[in-house]
């Protein structure tokens, strides 16, 4: 489990609890997700490489350290993953953005791809995949397999909630992918939804049923 990080910062846990409440409006849910994604981005980007840069302060010249956001790609698993993007782009505005569309077959719970669009040169970039939920793990596994065809430099997966079976599925299929989550919930129900969970993240973000 060395590639699994649970982000336990008090602000993360506070905002996640507010999001879980069934009476949270779509507006509140979106706002909280944006705030949470910024907080989680701090931990997820902790090991990003720095490059020396010469700058002028008001008093003298110095050498500072900067990250190269242009070497980073954020990949949203549609549609709920889009809720993560604004917050993360606030932290790393130079990042490129890709999208993969996957839907879950209600009969088999397997992921079916319907859209895939990535920036050029992904083989020279580190990649962060965002999706609020790691449930069965099927969508995450399918996404990683598709991304690896483009040979990105590295892949991280970021979610709000995960369950043990989803974590195990992703780790077994892609042990090189680092997983970041705000919480590990108890289990999946018979329909593949996380318990206690927070409901359908996409519906709650966009106010749909």
From Swiss-Prot:
CDD domains assigned to the protein according to its UniProt record, in alphabetical order: PRTases_typeI (cd06223)
Pathway membership: Pyrimidine metabolism; UMP biosynthesis via salvage pathway; UMP from uracil: step 1/1
Root EC class: transferase
Cofactor note: Binds 1 Mg(2+) ion per subunit. The magnesium is bound as Mg-PRPP.
Taxonomy, superkingdom: Bacteria
Catalyzed reaction equations: UMP + diphosphate = 5-phospho-alpha-D-ribose 1-diphosphate + uracil
Binding site for uracil: 194, 199-201
Activity regulation details: Allosterically activated by GTP.
Molecular function via GO: GTP binding; magnesium ion binding; uracil phosphoribosyltransferase activity
Cofactor(s) this protein requires: Mg(2+)
Swiss-Prot/TrEMBL GO biological process terms: UMP salvage; uracil salvage
Swiss-Prot/TrEMBL keywords: Allosteric enzyme, Glycosyltransferase, GTP-binding, Magnesium, Nucleotide-binding, Transferase
Entry EC number(s): 2.4.2.9
Binding-site residues for 5-phospho-alpha-D-ribose 1-diphosphate, renumbered to this chain: 79, 104, 131-139, 200
Pfam families per UniProt: UPRTase
NCBIfam families, alphabetized: PRK00129.1, upp
Similarity field: Belongs to the UPRTase family.
Role: Catalyzes the conversion of uracil and 5-phospho-alpha-D-ribose 1-diphosphate (PRPP) to UMP and diphosphate.
Protein name, as recorded: Uracil phosphoribosyltransferase
The species this protein was found in: Verminephrobacter eiseniae (strain EF01-2)
Lineage per the UniProt record: Bacteria, Pseudomonadati, Pseudomonadota, Betaproteobacteria, Burkholderiales
């Amino acid at each position: 489990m060395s590639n699994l990080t649970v982000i336990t910062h008090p602000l993360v846990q506070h905002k996640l609890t507010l999001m879980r409440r069934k009476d949270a409006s779509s507006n509140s849910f979106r706002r909280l997700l944006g705030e949470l994604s910024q907080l989680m981005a701090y931990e997820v980007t902790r090991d990003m490489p720095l490059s020396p840069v010469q700058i002028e302060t008001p008093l003298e010249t110095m050498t500072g350290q900067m990250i190269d956001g242009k070497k980073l790609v954020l990949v949203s698993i549609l549609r709920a993953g889009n809720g993560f993007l604004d917050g993360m782009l606030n932290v790393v505005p130079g990042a490129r953005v890709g999208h993969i569309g996957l839907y879950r077959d209600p009969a088999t719970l397997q992921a079916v791809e319907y859209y895939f669009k990535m920036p050029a040169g992904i083989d020279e970039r580190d990649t962060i995949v965002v999706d609020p939920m790691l449930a069965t793990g099927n969508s995450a596994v399918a996404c990683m397999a598709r991304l690896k065809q483009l040979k990105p430099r590295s892949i991280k997966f970021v979610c709000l909630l995960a369950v043990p079976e989803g974590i195990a599925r992703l780790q077994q299929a892609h042990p090189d992918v680092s997983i970041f989550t705000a919480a590990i919930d108890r289990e999946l129900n018979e329909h593949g939804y996380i318990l206690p969970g927070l409901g359908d993240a996409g519906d709650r973000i966009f106010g749909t049923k």
